[in-house]
């Protein structure tokens, strides 16, 4: 195992899991079966998704992982002799390796799912206590990515303390992101990397590192046990909340939570706000656009979760946005965009309905990306004031100069050249929509 001590851009030092072949340097791009099909999966659906990633041009944009989620194995148990998980022969008649061969032949990579418990979330055999056996199986089958969930944990392996995850999935109230009713809180200075949750995930990390194949490791412990403190030393990404749904309220809530974790995101490790819901449910086109843009600017893993053989052009266009994908995959600058102004609320307000509305981030090309969100339920005007954007406010200014600052600006959605914009850029946005600006040189 090779380790690199890095700084997560501003405040939080982290030990990052570095792979010599560069896998995991930037956030993952791919597709996953769960949001599209739940348990109703088979080899044909997985291979169809892989073919569509190629045919729709998504592979050319960097999408590479085709991930099988829960429900892929025989539910009744493991092979009694080898103790290996058995792929469901009805769903996968040629085994997982047969699907891997087809996916690899397209120049793509195959992912699979398990859990750090006795059973998966859908009740199938999981990997706790079988980490080495399963890691070896995955390697032999040609697996390139493991999503590792947090279901089926026996009571004797639950944590002795409870960590505050200010997420509505448990039905609690979190005033300004605090856990006022938290029971069994850890004592001050407690090292969550020594918790039983962390150890369960570390065991699979070590098993994956012991096999002769690089397997990207995606932790899915829902933000428990202060995973932000040890996730980067354990895997390539880590879920920071409960599950996403195809509703704007849930997307906004997760974006709000993750906005306070951006100092943990950098090369080799990224907080994961869950898979994309673009194309699912009753999300409006602006909501789909805002969802994708926020996830891309946060440098979250971008894992598509909709049936690609029936995706409409408008949703495909969102998922194919080259400027945002270029920002997301920058191989020189690892930090994501940061909120620089909350807009609807005073700065640093924790509000599940109204996340931070103004974000900015640098690129290796010298351009600055600026995102403006309308978190309200009606048309509103938003303004990006150059003097407020951290990456722009000191760029090329002259002391005591009264001349307004101007920058060359491009609309990231349309590619339209917006010309030389002085002082600020103002735009009317539909409910729950975003504007994304690519700000270039001065003019």
Curated annotation (Swiss-Prot):
Its main location: secreted. SUPFAM superfamilies: (Trans)glycosidases, Glycosyl hydrolase domain. Residues 1-16 form the signal peptide. Induction: Expression on xylan is very high, whereas elevated expression levels are also detected on galactose and xylose. The keyword Lipid metabolism does not apply. This is Probable alpha-galactosidase B. GO terms for cellular component: extracellular region. One of its GO terms (biological process) is carbohydrate metabolic process. The lineage of its organism: Eukaryota, Fungi, Dikarya, Ascomycota, Pezizomycotina. It is an enzyme of class 3 (hydrolase). It catalyses: Hydrolysis of terminal, non-reducing alpha-D-galactose residues in alpha-D-galactosides, including galactose oligosaccharides, galactomannans and galactolipids. PANTHER family: ALPHA-GALACTOSIDASE B-RELATED, ALPHA-GALACTOSIDASE/ALPHA-N-ACETYLGALACTOSAMINIDASE. Substrate binds at residues 221-225. Disulfide bonds join 39-71, 121-151. Glycans are attached at residues 79, 156, 176, 181, 212, 232, 282. One of its GO terms (molecular function) is alpha-galactosidase activity. It comes from Aspergillus niger. Hydrolyzes a variety of simple alpha-D-galactoside as well as more complex molecules such as oligosaccharides and polysaccharides.
